[in-house]
Regions:
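Acidic active-site catalytic centers that drive phospho-/nucleotidyl reactions
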Residues: 10, 36, 170
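Acidic/histidine-rich catalytic neighborhood
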Residues: 28-29, 35-73
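Active-site neighborhoods of enzymes that stabilize oxyanions during catalysis
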Residues: 61-162, 166-174
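Short, well-ordered beta-to-alpha junction loops that form the rim of enzyme active sites
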Residues: 1, 35-37, 117-120
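Sec/Tat-exported extracytoplasmic proteins
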Residues: 17-24, 74, 84-88, 178-182
């Protein structure tokens, strides 16, 4: 699952850097490898089928995933909310209750209920068949597994330094400085 993709990418990057390091200009090149988010492998025991708790036909639309966004039919929001508060491995908020740090929920297109699974949990409405169990992102962005990777090397970077986690937005000024853009 997730670890397999990481190992695959590691091998690709190793081949790439091996070839680049053979070039005469290699000592002059700065490299940055980053991602927009982390990934977590699903834990089958943490799977939540919302169909076990709620009738699917009580919703106008459901966006499965992480987070899961529910658009209840009129008059069903409070009922669904009270039921979902008791479901293990998830946190549910009414749209207006989503904590500000998530920067999510204020847009008119967001559904009335937002379900954030615990890391490794998958939430879906399924009638039959096996759930998709690979990996996902979109969990609590304060969880270490959701942090983006950042690797940098080259003449502009100190060697053998481990930097604390940083938000991706801080990469913009760094890249501008490297490219001498003001």
């Amino acid at each position: 699952a997730v670890i397999d993709r990481v190992e695959e990418l590691d091998a690709v990057l190793a081949r790439f850097f091996s070839k680049v390091n053979k070039l005469d200009i290699a000592p002059k090149i700065d490299f940055i490898v980053t991602s927009d988010h982390g990934m977590a492998t699903f834990v089958p025991d943490k799977y939540v089928n919302l169909g076990d708790y709620l009738p699917r036909d009580s919703f106008k639309f459901v966006f499965d995933g992480v987070p899961t966004v529910l658009y209840p039919k009129p008059g069903y929001t409070d009922t669904a909310y009270e039921i979902l508060k008791k479901v293990p491995n998830i946190t549910v908020w009414k749209k207006e209750e989503v904590p500000a740090r998530y920067q999510y929920g204020s847009n008119a297109r967001i559904g009335d209920l937002i379900v954030l699974p615990d890391v490794g949990c998958m939430v879906q409405f399924r009638d039959k068949g096996k759930p998709w169990l690979g990996g996902a992102h979109g969990y609590d962005n304060f969880d270490p597994t959701m942090q983006a990777i950042f690797y940098a090397s080259g003449p502009s970077f100190k060697k053998n330094v481990t930097h604390p986690s940083l938000p991706n937005i801080s990469l913009y000024p760094l890249i501008c400085r490297l490219l001498k853009i003001k």
